[in-house]
Design a protein with these regions (language model features):
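Vicinal oxygen chelate
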Residues: 15-18, 77-127
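Exposed loop/turn and edge beta-strand positions of beta-sandwich/beta-sheet ligand-binding modules
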Residues: 39, 73, 117
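Core segments of cupin and vicinal oxygen chelate
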Residues: 13-54
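Helix-adjacent hinge/juxtasegments
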Residues: 57, 63-81
């Protein structure tokens, strides 16, 4: 079988669901969507305007990045966005800054001239999960 579809969802582990709800809903402005009545707590958020989702559960051990800095070579997920400049400006309004140490939860790691050919911005969520904004252009 060949997989010819697209990514359906990403699952990350967190310590505090309500803190994560506030971050993904209020800071990143993702839409929370209903999830089935599993026997464990969690959250689902829509990624973009399609049926791709971010699934969040309380995780333990290896799922957690406790004490680890913003490092694009570590496990992360990437969100495709149109503009580097607009995304950077938007993240600044949310309190993120590039002059903070890499282990600060509001640090921005910027790669406007990434070797990948796509400008990149990296941030941390409250549980130190790394989020990449993979930009279509610099403008």
């Amino acid at each position: 079988m060949t997989i010819k579809s697209r990514l359906h969802h990403i699952l990350i582990g967190v310590d505090d669901l309500e803190r994560s709800r506030a971050f993904y809903r209020d800071v990143l402005e993702m839409q929370e969507v209903d999830r089935p009545p599993f026997k464990f707590a969690g959250l689902w958020f829509r990624i973009g305007d399609n049926d791709q989702h971010l699934h969040i559960i309380v995780g333990e051990g290896a799922m957690q990045r406790t004490g680890r800095p913003n490092n694009p070579q570590d496990v992360h997920f990437a969100l495709r966005v149109p503009s580097y400049r607009e995304t950077l400006d938007w993240l600044h309004t949310k309190g993120f800054r590039e002059d903070l140490p890499a282990d600060d939860l509001r640090s921005l790691m910027l790669r406007p001239n990434s070797i990948t050919g796509h400008p990149q911005i990296y941030i941390l969520d409250p549980d130190r999960n790394i989020i990449e904004f993979n930009c279509e252009s610099l403008d």
